[in-house]
Amino acid sequence: MKKNTLLNAELSYIIASLGHTDEITICDAGLPIPDRSQRIDLALIQGIPTFIDTVKATLAEMQIEGVIVAQEFKTVSPQLHDELMTLVQIEEELRGKPITISYIPHEEFKSHSHQSKAIVRTGECTPYANVIFQSGVVF
C-alpha cells in the first residue's frame, strides 16, 4: 500500500499494487535478474542512485512488515548493512509494530528474489547490498 508521492512511475505503480505479504527486491548493480521478473532499472552510473537512497524512497511509500537480507551483507558490508537496519528500526518505530528481519545465505537470497513482484536495480556497487521488503498493511 502506498503512503506518499514517488516520482518513478514504475516503482510507484508496483508499490500501489502490492497486497499483504507481496515482496519487492531492491538490489545492487550486480544481482542477477531473470527475464521473467519485472525489472525496474534505476541504475544510471556506478553509485547512482545509491542503495540507501532507493530504500528511503521506497520506505516513504511502502508499508513493510518483513525484511530479508543475505547473511553475507552483515559481515562483508557492515556499514551499509547498519544503515539499512537503522532505517528499518525507524520504520518499525513509526509503524508501532515489529518488522521481522530474516537472514539467509546469498544463493538462497538470489533464488528467493525471483518471487518478488519486481526487482529494483540501483547503481550501488557495494557487495551484497540487496534487500527484500515484504509488504504489510497500513491498518
Swiss-Prot record:
It catalyses: beta-D-ribopyranose = beta-D-ribofuranose. GO terms for biological process: D-ribose catabolic process. It is found in: Cytoplasm. InterPro entries: D-ribose_pyranase, RbsD-like_sf, RbsD_FucU. One of its GO terms (molecular function) is monosaccharide binding. Substrate binds at residues 28, 106, 128-130. SUPFAM superfamilies: RbsD-like. The active site is at 20 (proton donor). Its EC number is 5.4.99.62. Pathway: Carbohydrate metabolism; D-ribose degradation; D-ribose 5-phosphate from beta-D-ribopyranose: step 1/2. Its main location: cytoplasm. It comes from the Bacteria. Keywords: Carbohydrate metabolism, Cytoplasm, Isomerase. One of its GO terms (cellular component) is cytosol. Catalyzes the interconversion of beta-pyran and beta-furan forms of D-ribose. Homodecamer. NCBIfam families: PRK11797.1. PANTHER family: D-RIBOSE PYRANASE (PTHR37831:SF1). Belongs to the RbsD / FucU family. RbsD subfamily. This is D-ribose pyranase. It comes from Aliivibrio salmonicida (strain LFI1238) (Vibrio salmonicida (strain LFI1238)).
